[in-house]
Amino acid sequence: MPNYYSTSDLNLASAIIVSWYQLSHIQKDKGKGLFFFEPSHKLAKFTEDYFLWRIRLDPMEYSGSIKTLKNYLYNTP
């Protein structure tokens, strides 16, 4: 299994997805998720920019992504 970038931060995972990075898989544990993405230099830069408040996202896409991930976490076995 390759090394992945992972985060348990739902908001960060949603921002990454909205920015067209491919979600590899999700590990669920008691309603919480660990989100895995293929690593890349662009993703590392995006994550840094996210925490420095440097990114711009479409608010509707972002909130939709959060909703979709929450539904997956809470409504799938």
Q: Where is each model-derived feature located?
A:
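N-terminal acidic leader/helix
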Residues: 2-32
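C-terminal basic regulatory modules in eukaryotic proteins
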Residues: 5, 44-77
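Surface-exposed beta-strand edges and their flanking turn/coil or helix-capping segments
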Residues: 20-21, 38, 49-52
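Acidic, low-complexity, intrinsically disordered interaction modules
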Residues: 30-32, 36-38, 42-46
